[in-house]
Amino acid sequence: MHPFYSRAATMIGEIAAAVSFISKFLRTKGLTSERQLQTFSQSLQELLAEHYKHHWFPEKPCKGSGYRCIRINHKMDPLIGQAAQRIGLSSQELFRLLPSELTLWVDPYEVSYRIGEDGSICVLYEASPAGGSTQNSTNVQMVDSRISCKEELLLGRTSPSKNYNMMTVSG
């Protein structure tokens, strides 16, 4: 098997977790239909997979992390913007639906996020490499975030947060 295909297989869970997280913001506000959400999610998954395909290194998860980072900092991440355009969301609508400050790190075996520049970093998805590089040989868990992270998600805070302990779960 070509090395890219085995690498690509490992990013499926990570991309799905990131897309689900972003899509929840659109769903929470209730301004998009279920069909629009599905189209947005599918488009964003495809865009991220294409964007990451030569920058995914399961053997060195931190390599390329900056390239894979999804960032909203008063500017919209271009990949989120492209997916939103496909469902007819304007830039203004998208900025109303998403936090003005969001960083989402999509790395092999872990997806984490921070809302606000001084917010807590919360782990959204975690997997452990268990002897192989495909999804089937990986112990995968969705990580339940602490109440503080859920509050940040629901409120879309942009103000500095209090210091919270970060909880991670590994199998």
Swiss-Prot record:
One of its GO terms (cellular component) is nucleus. SMART domains: btg1. The modification Phosphoserine is found at S159. It comes from the Eukaryota. The keyword Phosphoprotein applies. GO terms for biological process: negative regulation of cell population proliferation; positive regulation of angiogenesis; positive regulation of endothelial cell differentiation; positive regulation of fibroblast apoptotic process. One of its GO terms (molecular function) is enzyme binding. InterPro entries: Anti_prolifrtn, BTG, BTG-like_sf. Anti-proliferative protein. Belongs to the BTG family. Interacts with CNOT7 and CNOT8. This is Protein BTG1. It comes from Bos taurus. The gene is BTG1.
